[in-house]
C-alpha cells in the first residue's frame, strides 16, 4: 500500500515538473472586454477564427448589452479591436448572445453567425430576436447578409 502511495507521489511530482506553465499577459494583450448581462441571459459567446487568413487566430467576443469585439491578433501577443473597420458595426444595435464562425459559402474565408436577444432600442420588451450572418469579403471586411 505504501509503495503505491509513494509511486503515486513520485508520478505526481514528475507530472507537475513536466507540466506547462502559463504567464498572465491580460493587461498587455489589448483585450479589455466584459459581457454585460441582459436579464434572463446566461453569458456571452466567443469564436476563435482567422478572419484575415494571416495564419494567426483572432477572436470575436459577444458583449450582451456592451459592444461586441472582433480582436485581430497582431502576431506579438496583443490584439486590436477592428469591429468597425471590418464593417461589423450593425451588430452594435443588438443585445448579442452567441457567435459561431465557419466558411458558410466555401470561399476560403471565415464568416460569422451572431445570435441576438433583442435590439438595444427595444430592450424593455423581448420580440423575436434577429440572428445575424456576416459574409467575409476577403479584404478585412464583412457584408451583412442577414434577412431584414
Model-derived regions, located:
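Sec-dependent N-terminal signal peptides
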Residues: 4-13
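Acidic, glycine/proline-rich Ca2+-coordinating loop motifs
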Residues: 17-148
